[in-house]
Amino acid sequence: LLNEKEATNILVGGIDEMTDVSFKILSRLGLYKRKPISNLSLYVEKNSGSIGGEGSAFFLLSDQSLQENIAEIIGLQTYFKPGNAQAMELNIQNFLYKHSISLNESDLILLGINGDISNDKVYTYLGKNIFKHIPQANYKHLCGEYPTSVSFALWLAAMIIKNNTVPGIIQVQPMTTVPKNILIYNHYYGLYHSLILISNCSN
């Protein structure tokens, strides 16, 4: 709508609420870990399942360059069953090329690793290959796993850009630089994948 000039300001967001029924069903399907764990131990436990989450996030998008703007969404792309990790690696390269951003210009990769050993294979592969020399961070130990958790990641990325700092609790390795371009990559149990490129405002 913004690109087609049908609106100037749009409120968008995502909501997911965890109920007792949905928790029981998803637990039976093996989406959650069988035993309670601390969220801070999510990436230490090398087994199946994640931790359940819920959340809501809303953003005011505008086509106007204003001083109070926090960040700019450069690009967004979704994929349904894109294939194996190598196929997703190619998708990421094409996505960055489309938006005239090189890998070296990506200051931070925000990943949707959720602690499920099978689910995280694609992240592990990308972390050792295309993202090998780029600082990485995780976020699902803070919000849990849910279908629209990428909205939490987008909020987190915007706050990183606004405050010029990366919280230590999300860093995979210590960072010394302030990110200007953040690439968010998330997938929901291998089915729905998304890429969001967010940057500081150029105004």
Regions found by a protein language model. Name each.
Residues R28-L108, H133, N181, Y189-G190, ...:
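Condensing-enzyme catalytic core mediating Claisen C-C bond formation in acyl metabolism
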